[in-house]
Amino acid sequence: MTLQFEAFCAGGLAPGWSLTVQGHADAGEEKFEINFLTDAGDIAFHVKPRFSSATVVGNAFQGGRWGQEEVSSIFPLTLGEPFEMEVSADAEHFHIYAQEQKVLQFPHRHRPLATITRVRVLSEHRLAQVELAKRSLSWGDGGY
C-alpha cells in the first residue's frame, strides 16, 4: 500500500478531532487503512475496510502486539464507486462512518489520547480529499 496522507496532530488527539477521507474504490483495489499513531510507535487505532468480506475492522497495536479485532458487517461501500469515510473521537470511543452511516464504535485502548500525535492513510485507491479537523465540543444551551 502507498502512503497517501500523513499529518501531525498538534497537541495530540482530543475529543472533537475527526478525519474525513474521500476517494474512489476502484475494482481490484481492495486495500485501504487509517492508522492513528503514538510517538512510542504504537498504533492506537487501526481501521480497515475489507471489501472482500464486506466488513470494517478496528484494532490497536500496543507493546509489540495486535489486540482483539472488532469487526462490523455494516458495509455501505461498493467497489467501483466513490466513497467517504469519517473517523471521529470523543472521550471514550472512535466512531467510524462510511457513506454517512455509522459502521463501528471502537473503545479507546490507548490513554491518554494526547499521546496520539500522527494520522496516516494508506491506500491503493485514488483519494480525492483528506481532511483532519479539530472541532470544539459544547454542551448545554449556550446561555440563552
Curated annotation (Swiss-Prot):
GO terms for molecular function: carbohydrate binding. Pfam families: Gal-bind_lectin. It comes from the Eukaryota. This is Grifin. It comes from Mus musculus (Mouse). Residues 5-133 form the Galectin domain. Homodimer. Keywords: Lectin, Phosphoprotein. The gene is Grifin. The galectin domain is atypical and does not bind beta-galactoside sugars. The modification Phosphoserine is found at S138.
